[in-house]
């Protein structure tokens, strides 16, 4: 049985995809709702560990301001520490779908 791909579907072979649970303006990461496509190097894994909380804070702020809305699909793109995070609620009223990958230059 193959593992399902989680998060936003992108044509990028190295990415972390996840479905975050939204509770008000807070986001919760559940490991069983995430998947990795490709293989991150040790350095990329450290960057991801360092950067992930920053992306969560930015997305929570966007939920507060309405830039990310649980009622309307709208993709936002965030950049930090040579990583890109795309996020969208897809109008799901309870989830934020993400894809995080190395920034393409």
Curated annotation (Swiss-Prot):
Phosphoprotein is among the record's keywords: no
Keyword vocabulary terms for this entry: Toxin-antitoxin system
InterPro entries according to UniProt: Antitoxin_CbeA, CbeA_sf
Coiled-coil boundaries: none
Disulfide bonds: none
Disruption phenotype: Single deletion has no effect on expression of cognate toxin ykfI i.e. the probable operon is not autoregulatory. Deletion of 3 type IV antitoxin genes (cbeA, yafW, yfjZ) has no effect on cell growth.
Keyword Translocase: no
One family name in Pfam for this protein: CbeA_antitoxin
Induction of synthesis: Expressed in mid-log phase at considerably lower levels than antitoxin relB.
Function description: Antitoxin component of a type IV toxin-antitoxin (TA) system. Antitoxin that counteracts the effect of cognate toxin YkfI. It does not seem to bind to the cognate toxin but instead induces toxin loss by an unknown mechanism. Co-overexpression of toxin YkfI and antitoxin YafW leads to formation of elongated cells.
Stated family: Belongs to the CbeA/YafW/YfjZ antitoxin family.
Protein name in UniProt: Antitoxin YafW
Organism whose genome encodes this protein: Escherichia coli (strain K12)
Biological classification of the source: Bacteria, Pseudomonadati, Pseudomonadota, Gammaproteobacteria, Enterobacterales
Gene behind this protein: yafW
